[in-house]
């Protein structure tokens, strides 16, 4: 049977781990790495060993002891100590505001008897009587409060370190006085502190007032030893001046440069516009049921002005971590239902790939120091009308999330024409008001953003921000780095898969039913399934491994694993307490194991809900206990094989996704039956149920307890020809009991005979199954 391919994928998935391990060991053992000598390997490759140049840092670290500076005249800043080092006798400094403050400090060497000395202060000759009987230097602070007054000695500092200090702070001028090492500070008043200027005749240092304790230490104990060597050269005070320049958001900075390569830092402010893509798929039938409402990747191209430059940008928006919701209004064909609709919430992420035509993206291959900062944006959903043929329409309305920047990486965007190295911005989500509801249903006050109408009529959502990166680019600006050298993070196959899905779905009309039945009866294996793509055995093995890696994470593989565990648990429970077994316990094996006995009792009353729950696991039961009849998976695998052979776009990279998706999505509307003597019990995935006699095809009451017992003990059969088709066939053509029994058992030979006879009812049923094989 063709469905053998699915069983092989389920049972052989374990070999993938072993294959990966062997491949990794082989790679480690045989990998050769060659690095050519010299600064660069080849001109078309990046440097073998490249490092960053100067790293700009906006953090300003203020030194404790800044200097020494050469003698100068300037207006000292407030809140900074001037520490002046006198290396000879005479005037150390002069300071005035030309209104109420004149002061000068005179240095006198040790052991000087009382005498008169001449000094030039503020351009005038002044004579002072000085004396120093100590072994230390003395610094006389001479002061006057007006231009007509005479100087007088206000303070004296006795020091063997030959250091004096001066500070403008708090409307006063502060200096040191006393004798080291116990000198202290004192101050003089002035009404015009800011206009005080100073003429310094010796080398000096600058110390912030926040480090006044250090200044006190230097006055009393001397400068650090390093400041007293001949290697310390005083600088001009102009070297301290800083040219303030407002940083440009958009700029290109050359970090380092050689003959072939240079490092460029690109700073850019950006405007990101994006929109969500979605897909709404309606089930066939009367028009009351929807199959899927899901998010899809969406491209958006736009232009905006940046510093007078017109920029063309391209974004791709995709989502990850979606939450699957469903709504089932009942089992009748006219009951409204949605099999699955996606909602993004707090556990979801939104990815926006951004590219523009500026220099920053031209050679964005070797990148480091990537950083970004973006604003948040709120996305509020709109309304979507489920247009039913009759009655008032349900409306999905509302829902909102806020996007918050969470990181940036490199990526590759695939447009219709070219692949682009771009930036991928990652956003975390928080739910926001309003909540969403499906009006005229029980679904109300849920939070998140559903995929029905995420753009709410807006052409795009917009956010602003900036990014910075350092890129290694060719020194020649006209040279384009080959895209083949790209080390971007991701290779996105979504565009290829989308084209392949369209091709696969269009091939359904070209499948011959007689050949399909023959193919469905063949035991397909890995080689025969993939031989239509590549003829060599080695490539087929590699493709089979890739398919198994993808398939083991599929819903089918996960469901088989969960069911095996559930049945094991149920068997062990039954062996421990065999006497407790009842119909309800049998039913619980086929319903949600987490429900309590009381809940199951309530569910029995709703036969439609119960049968719908059971039918979802009958595919797994049929796959575990294979019968001789044809199954839906045989047809599914045969259609898959046929389309693979007919496809012109299938390839090694897309095959794993296609096989896995086909196993989950081909023939979603299935019916299963169990046969006991002359009675048949049949249910389908939509919750419909029938019980009827084999010989007359007349309906009888459906007993769910009996059905649960039969499912446990009897084989499950795919209802290829369901009860509705059987009834129609019997009413129009008349069939014998043996033909009816063979069709009930899905006998492939009988099916082939009816198709070869061009029976329109059977052919139409098989055609409908083929048309359900869509991606």
Swiss-Prot record:
- Map motif DGE motif onto the chain: 307-309
Segment Spike head: which positions?
65-223
Coiled-coil intervals? 483-510
Q: Which cysteines are joined by disulfide bonds?
A: 317-379
**Residue span of region Hydrophobic:** 388-408
| Pfam families per the UniProt record, alphabetical | Rota_VP4_MID, VP4_haemagglut, VP4_helical
State any further remark.
This strain probably does not use sialic acid to attach to the host cell.
Origin species, per record, is: Rotavirus A (strain RVA/Human/Philippines/L26/1987/G12P1B[4]) (RV-A)
Q: Annotated motif KID motif: location in the chain?
A: 643-645
Instruction: Name the segments for region: Spike body and stalk (antigen domain).
Output: 247-478
What are the start and end residues of every segment in region (Spike foot)? Answer: 509-775
Q: Please give the name of this protein.
A: Outer capsid protein VP4
- Residue(s) at site: Cleavage: 230-231, 240-241, 246-247
Record key words, sorted: Capsid protein, Coiled coil, Disulfide bond, Hemagglutinin, Host cell membrane, Host cytoplasm, Host cytoskeleton, Host endoplasmic reticulum, Host membrane, Host-virus interaction, Membrane, Outer capsid protein, Viral attachment to host cell, Viral penetration into host cytoplasm, Viral penetration via permeabilization of host membrane, Virion, Virus entry into host cell
The family note in this entry says: Belongs to the rotavirus VP4 family.
Give the transmembrane ranges.
Answer: none
The processes (GO biological process) annotated in the record are: permeabilization of host organelle membrane involved in viral entry into host cell; virion attachment to host cell
């Amino acid at each position: 049977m063709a469905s053998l391919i699915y069983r092989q994928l389920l049972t052989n998935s374990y070999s993938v781990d072993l294959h990966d391990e062997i491949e990794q060991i082989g790679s480690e053992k045989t990998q050769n790495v060659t690095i050519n000598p010299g600064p660069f390997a080849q001109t078309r490759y990046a440097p073998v060993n490249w490092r960053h140049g100067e790293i700009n840092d906006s953090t300003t670290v203020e030194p404790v002891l800044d200097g020494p500076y050469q003698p100068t005249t300037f207006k000292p800043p407030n809140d900074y100590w001037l520490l002046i080092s006198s290396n000879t006798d005479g005037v150390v400094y002069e300071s005035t505001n030309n209104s109420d403050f004149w002061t000068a400090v005179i240095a006198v060497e040790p052991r000087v008897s009382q005498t008169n000395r001449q000094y030039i202060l503020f351009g005038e000759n002044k004579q002072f009587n000085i004396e120093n009987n100590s072994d230390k230097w003395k610094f006389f602070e001479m002061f006057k409060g007006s231009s007509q007054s005479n100087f007088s000695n206000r303070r004296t500092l006795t020091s063997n370190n030959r250091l004096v200090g001066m500070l403008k702070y708090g409307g006063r001028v502060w200096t040191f006085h006393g004798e080291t090492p116990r000198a202290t500070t004192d101050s003089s008043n002035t009404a015009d502190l800011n206009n005080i200027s100073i003429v310094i005749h010796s080398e000096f240092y600058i110390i912030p007032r926040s480090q006044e304790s250090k200044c006190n230490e230097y006055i009393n104990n001397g400068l650090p030893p390093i400041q007293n060597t001949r290697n310390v050269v005083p600088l001009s005070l102009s070297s301290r001046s800083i040219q303030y320049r407002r940083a440009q958001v958009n700029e290109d900075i050359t970090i380092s440069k050689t003959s072939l390569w240079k490092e460029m830092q690109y700073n850019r402010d950006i405007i990101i516009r994006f929109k969500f893509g979605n897909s709404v798929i309606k089930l066939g039938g009367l028009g009351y049921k929807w199959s899927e409402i899901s998010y899809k990747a969406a491209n958006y191209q736009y232009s905006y002005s940046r510093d007078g430059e017109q920029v063309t940008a391209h974004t791709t928006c995709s989502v990850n971590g979606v939450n699957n919701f469903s709504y089932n209004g009942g089992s009748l064909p006219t009951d409204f239902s949605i099999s699955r609709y996606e909602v993004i919430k707090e556990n979801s992420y939104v990815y926006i790939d951004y590219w523009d035509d500026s220099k920053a993206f031209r050679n964005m291959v070797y990148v480091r120091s990537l950083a970004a900062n973006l604003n948040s944006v709120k996305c509020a959903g709109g309304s979507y009308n489920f247009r039913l043929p009759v009655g008032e329409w349900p409306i999905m309305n509302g829902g909102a999330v806020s996007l918050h920047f969470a990181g940036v990486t490199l990526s590759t965007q695939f447009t219709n024409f070219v692949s682009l190295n771009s930036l991928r911005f990652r956003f975390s989500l928080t739910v926001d008001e309003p909540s969403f509801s499906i009006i005229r249903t029980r679904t109300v006050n849920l939070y998140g953003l559903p995929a029905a109408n995420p753009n709410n009529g807006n052409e795009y959502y917009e956010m602003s921000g900036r990014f910075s990166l350092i890129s290694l680019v060719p020194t020649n600006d006209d040279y384009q780095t080959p895209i083949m050298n790209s080390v971007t993070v991701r290779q996105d196959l979504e565009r290829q898969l989308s084209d392949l899905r369209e091709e696969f779905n269009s091939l359904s009309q070209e499948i011959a039913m007689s050949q399909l039945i023959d193919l469905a009866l063949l035991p397909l294996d890995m080689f025969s399934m993939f031989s239509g793509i590549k003829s060599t055995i080695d490539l087929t093995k590699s493709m089979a491994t890739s398919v198994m890696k993808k398939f083991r994470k599929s819903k089918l593989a996960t469901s088989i694993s969960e069911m095996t565990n559930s049945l094991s648990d149920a068997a062990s429970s039954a062996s421990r307490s065999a006497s407790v077994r009842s119909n309800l316990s049998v039913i619980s094996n086929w319903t949600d194991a987490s429900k309590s006995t009381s809940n199951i009792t309530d569910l029995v009353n709703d036969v439609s809900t119960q049968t719908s729950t059971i039918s979802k696991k009958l595919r797994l039961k049929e796959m575990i206990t294979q019968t001789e009849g044809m199954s839906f998976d045989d047809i599914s695998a045969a259609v898959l094989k046929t389309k693979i052979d007919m496809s012109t776009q299938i390839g090694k990279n897309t095959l794993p996704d296609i096989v896995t998706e086909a196993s989950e999505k081909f023939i979603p509307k299935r019916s299963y039956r169990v046969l006991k003597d002359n009675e048949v019990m049949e249910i389908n995935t939509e919750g419909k149920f029938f019980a009827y006699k084999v010989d007359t095809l007349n309906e009888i009451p459906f007993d769910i307890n009996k059905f649960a017992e039969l499912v446990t003990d009897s084989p499950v059969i795919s209802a290829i020809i369901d009860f509705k088709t059987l009834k129609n066939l019997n009413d129009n053509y008349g069939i014998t009991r043996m033909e009816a029994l063979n069709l009930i058992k899905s006998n492939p030979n009988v099916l082939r005979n009816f198709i070869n006879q061009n029976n329109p009812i059977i052919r139409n049923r098989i055609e409908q199954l083929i048309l359900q094989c869509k991606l």
